[in-house]
Swiss-Prot record:
Keywords: Cytoplasm, FAD, Flavoprotein, Methyltransferase, Multifunctional enzyme, Oxidoreductase, S-adenosyl-L-methionine, Transferase, tRNA processing. The gene is mnmC. This is tRNA 5-methylaminomethyl-2-thiouridine biosynthesis bifunctional protein MnmC. In the N-terminal section; belongs to the methyltransferase superfamily. tRNA (mnm(5)s(2)U34)-methyltransferase family. In the C-terminal section; belongs to the DAO family. It comes from Burkholderia lata (strain ATCC 17760 / DSM 23089 / LMG 22485 / NCIMB 9086 / R18194 / 383). Its EC number is 2.1.1.61, 1.5.-.-.
């Protein structure tokens, strides 16, 4: 169960200074000049990041963002700066957007910090637990905020830190942040000779640092040092970039998953060959007229809830970035309602809502009367209103991502990959005659059900599910103000057509349209929204579309590096208690498939995860969630159960 997020508030003292009443002055963080002296100069910056591809700073607090703004300004002012600056900050009590703007403006006033406070405030995420990734300066400065309790979140971050900003660790009033557990967590993500700096210090902090492998020294009123343990190497080292001679990749599959990967790799300077078996991108399920887009909510905030929340929020941020860069696409912006299927279902929704305590910009609970008023239609139950949920035209999104990649992507359409073969340091995508279609050190399989065949995976549980949707002509239904889901869905399209659906037919691979499928969709939506459809139309006269979704047994996607199954099976005894990090991997082979009906929610986050893994950057997912979507998870279960050698 995820703890509720308790935001900090901001108040004005009689003397005109700002303070957080609950957490005091220290929650604001260092002011601009102090932040620069402590966290920038104290970590040997800008010299240490110069001429590097990436540099990662991890902060034990964020407050009003003084340390981040100081680092951003120093990076901007340095002509020899690293190509990409990552700043990861844990914050148990974030400010609201308005309070953040006021506090940040307050602490940077009359300093030389030139970073744009408004840009930070404009990008500020919804106040819900988890990781939030924000990009600035065309994606070259990346802020990852970890909202949640410090010890908990530090243990979930996957990164290789080059420098630490120990915000809050010097305060004797903050026993939590002074604990050995926090500093030990920092030691697990510290890169070789990672430095730290803190203004003032306590004996407890010095003891914790020394015990966890950090050396330190006092310089004036600063405590500075580096990670230099005397003991042997750690069992699990922080992630490094994949060593490749050239930054080239092949992406197989040009749907939501593949186009998202293409855009994220191209944004980092990779040259990508995109291979699609159809004559255009977004031709299979990604070619549907629209798809609904929303997170899940459960009382226990389980893995699926946290993963869909992270994917939902990350996708919103990425889509806005695409639109701001001139790559707009069709999507609804007036929210989405998830209606309960029964009274018991509504009580489950209420329990989840009350347990999570979300802000209204994330979700609101609607009783029957409120849902009826919002939709102007009769409803059987209340539900949840997601103001930023809605419907997206998947093909338009794919086209926008493809356009954003620009000249860094080359499309091979109407091309089938018969086989993948590793030759030396490169993968070769081969046609039916054995000829090379493309070669690169990295391949990302984003081709749904065909991915397991190409990778030769035996321990991946994929199942095809037939989905038929129905299109009702303009004027044939009552007006619907926003997409609505429950047992089925109804989506108003721009031309007045109403999209309803969809059937869910496991292991059915018949591509033909069926009148029975239309009738099933009509009956389901009549139950969902009794006043939406009058007399049932003749199903034989209706238009629609059939597409196939590929789902995984646990209903989670497959994202990340693919396992070397043969190598793992050969070493099965030693790996019977393995974690995901212990398994051998096929060099440079990654997967982004098994999205089921949640491609819109998971594709952007999955692409960012894979790009971050390739580049050795901080991951946009917590370790537990990354393990939950690891393509090797079924192999791990088979190894633990000693069932290797047959599909698991």
């Amino acid at each position: 169960m995820t703890d509720r997020l308790v935001p900090a508030s901001l108040a004005l003292r009689d003397d005109g200074t700002l303070v957080s009443p609950e957490f005091g002055d220290l929650h604001l963080g260092a002011s601009g000049a102090l932040a620069h002296r402590v966290f920038v100069a104290g970590n040997g910056l800008p010299t240490r990041w110069q001429d590097r591809r990436t540099f990662t700073i991890v902060a034990t607090g964020f407050g009003a963002g003084g340390s981040f703004l100081a680092a951003w300004a120093a990076w901007r002012d340095d002509p020899a700066r690293c190509e990409r600056l990552h700043f990861v900050a844990v914050e148990p009590h974030p400010f609201s957007r308005d309070d953040l703007r006021r506090a940040a403006t307050h602490i940077v006033a009359d300093t030389t910090i030139s970073a744009d406070v408004e840009a930070l405030a404009d990008a500020w995420p919804m106040l819900v637990p988890g990781l939030h990734r924000l990009e600035f300066d065309e994606g070259r400065v990346v802020l990852t905020l970890a909202f949640g309790e410090s010890i908990d979140m530090l243990g979930k971050i996957v990164a290789r830190a080059d420098a630490f900003c120990l915000d809050g660790l010097a305060s004797s009033s903050d026993a939590d942040l002074q604990s050995t557990d926090v500093v030990r967590a920092l030691s697990k993500i510290a890169g070789e000779h990672a430095t730290f700096a803190v203004h003032a210090s306590s004996d407890a902090l010095k003891h914790a640092l020394g015990k966890s492998g950090f050396t330190y020294r006092e310089v004036d009123d600063l405590l500075v040092g580096e990670y230099a343990p005397r003991w042997r190497a750690r069992r699990h080292e922080p992630p490094l970039a994949l060593p490749v001679a050239t930054r080239r990749a092949i992406v197989i599959g040009a749907g939501l998953a593949g186009c998202a990967v293409v855009e994220r790799l191209a944004a980092r300077g990779w040259e990508v060959t995109l291979i699609e078996r159809h004559d255009r991108i977004a031709s299979d399920a990604s070619g549907n007229p629209a798809g609904v887009f929303h997170p899940l909510m459960t009382r226990d905030d389980n893995v699926a809830s946290r993963l869909t929340r992270g994917g939902f929020l990350h996708a919103i941020a990425r889509w806005r970035a695409l639109e701001n860069a001139g790559h707009a696409f069709a999507r609804s912006t007036n929210g989405m309602i998830h209606l309960a299927e029964s009274a018991d279902d509504f009580e489950r929704m209420r329990d989840a809502f009350d347990a999570f305590g979300p802000p209204s910009d994330y979700v609101s609970l609607l009783d029957i009367e409120a849902a009826r008023a919002h939709l102007n239609l009769s409803v059987a139950q209340g539900g949840l209103l997601f103001p930023h949920g809605g419907a997206v035209w998947p093909a338009g999104l794919c086209a926008a991502q493809y356009a954003a990649a620009g000249e860094r992507v080359r499309l091979l359409a109407s091309t089938r990959v018969a086989k993948l073969e590793r030759r030396g340091d490169a993968w070769h995508a081969l046609d039916d005659a054995g000829g090379t279609l493309a070669e690169a050190p990295v391949v990302v399989l984003a081709n749904a059900g065909d991915a397991a065949r190409l990778a030769g995976l035996q321990h991946v549980a994929l199942q095809p599910v037939r989905g038929q949707l129905t299109l009702l002509p303009p004027g044939s239904t009552a007006p619907l103000p926003c997409p609505t889901i429950g047992d089925g869905y109804a989506v108003p399209l721009d031309d007045g057509t109403l999209l309803i659906g969809a059937t869910f037919e496991p292991d059915d691979v018949d591509p033909a349209m069926r009148a029975a499928g239309h009738l099933e969709n009509l009956e389901r939506v009549r139950h969902l929204l009794p006043g939406l459809i009058g007399d049932l139309p003749d199903p034989d006269t209706l238009r629609g579309r059939v597409a196939f979704r590929w789902v995984v047994g646990d209903r989670l996607p497959l994202l990340g590096p693919l396992a070397d199954e043969a190598g793992a099976i050969a070493n099965a005894r030693a790996l019977s208690g393995a974690q995901a990090r212990d398994l051998p991997r096929l060099p440079g082979l990654y997967g982004a498939f098994g999205f089921g009906s949640r491609g819109l929610v998971w594709a952007a986050l999955g692409a960012e995860l894979i790009a971050s893994q390739l580049e050795g950057e901080p991951w946009p997912l917590e370790r537990e969630l990354a393990d939950a979507v690891d393509p090797a998870r079924f192999l791990i279960r088979a190894l633990r159960a000693r069932r290797v050698g047959r599909a698991g």
